[in-house]
Amino acid sequence: MRRGQRFTPVRLRRWLESGRGTGFGANYQPWHQVTRADPGSRGRSHLINGRLSRQHHLLSDGEEEAFGFATMLPGLSDLREQHPLSTEDRIGDDVAVACLAGSPWIEGTLSIASALGLKHPTVHKAGDCEPWRFSTDLVLHLDTPSGSSEVIAVSVKQSDELKRQRTLELLQIEREYWARQGVTWILLTEQLYSKDVGLSIRAGLSWTLGQPQALAAHLNLCAALAPAFDGRTLGDVLTLIEQRCVVSQEAAQAIFWQSVWRGDTPINLAMSVRPGATFEMLSATSFWQQNPIAARRSAWTL
């Protein structure tokens, strides 16, 4: 993404016409993308290979950590980052339609902003004007054990950003957009989890996504060995997995982290992942409480 690029009415219309923000699974096109032609983000951008056979476009370290938390969720069937919100009221084919109890009518951000008495942002250039298109950082589809589906919308912010009144107003519009569709909306900040947990998530991502799926037999064996990991170092744990699964250390890393991601090896993610640090094993409930999305924790307090 280039710092010199700017959002313009023409650019927004071009994105809409090209199909950005549409599609499912491997065919989804994010609204904002990490490309040389896109305006730059304020954070450090990331392109990550995921389970959906495409690259995911993440615009900050916080979004990368949120993405890691999201990919751990049981039943995750689709993940769409940089998901655009409709500006106009319409009959929708939006991801949230499956959650609607009644008519699939989507109220656009222009109507919602007016109802809330808030100014809707716009983009101007040379006398041309276009309503700004809001986007939600992550929109998750979950298949539940009961056979139903759930949609979770996640917005990622730094806590310092919430000191600005205009930021809160824009978030209020985004929250209301999803609330009117019956969708759970989570505001995720770094204060909802420790820095060490975030570091563990980012360390584990490289071994869980874009890597070959570990054999089910190896994952099951790792889960069976998990109680013995308590008090051991990462190096000791990897050696044990290597020996019992008869694999390389690289393969042992993938087996270990993929087992953690499934919740079958419930480690304390706040413990350092350096080779000399020791692990603490947790109950399944305590393990999932470390994940703010799984726990449905939100920084929104208004």
Report residues per predicted region.
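Electrostatic, structured charged patches in enzyme active sites and in nucleic-acid/phosphate-binding
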Residues: 1-302
